[in-house]
């Protein structure tokens, strides 16, 4: 449990669903904290605080899908930049990187990040980030986040980790040195097959400002209904993950 601070307007311990697009101003240009729900919504904000707390980050962001979250993170880079990725990343991630973002001049290389020497050999002069997925979907290949993050910092690179399969219940990449964490919240975080969502968490105010600018500009935000459903799902995350873990151990 995290992010449970009560609704600021009413004191409700369960965040209300603010199904609203615009907000009344106190005066012309004087807002009460929100102006337009693409930019910010109280229900979505509560979810963003929640995931940031769970991951131990500075700020969280909620998107309309995991791919919306990943794509928005990739929009932090520019034409001519290079990103190194785990070779067994989720198929949707591979597709958007290799078939869509490549059209905008963002280069990529996919390697087995489980071996640091592969990463070292694939780094280029224009490399800006290392994107890890660990364990991977679907082959469950594992990468040492701490070792890669340490190397990335030495090279001045960002470390991005897809934490979908482990969730913050079992793994907190920021504590291991990562700069950005991304989730397809559709899976374990939501847990009930009733919401499609993506989440991201960053470890600095600078990255928070940059990613919020992209989130607001592109507009692939999570709606208040889905934000509320996801918060409700996360309340049972610990119980569910323990059961998943026990079942997996029995099968193994």
Whereabouts are the PLM-identified features?
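Short conserved active-site loop signatures built around small residues
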Residues: 1-17
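Active-site donor-binding loop signature of nucleotide-sugar glycosyltransferases
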Residues: 2, 21, 113
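Short Gly/Pro-enriched turn/cap motifs at secondary-structure boundaries
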Residues: 7-10, 40, 189
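Short, basic and Ser/Thr-rich N-terminal targeting/leader segments
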Residues: 12-13, 45, 56, 104
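A generic secondary-structure signal marking the coil-to-beta-strand transition
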Residues: 13-17, 32, 59, 226
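Conserved N-terminal alpha-helix of the aminotransferase class I/II PLP-enzyme fold
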Residues: 22-71, 76, 92-99
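Conserved PLP-enzyme active-site core in the AAT-like
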Residues: 61-252
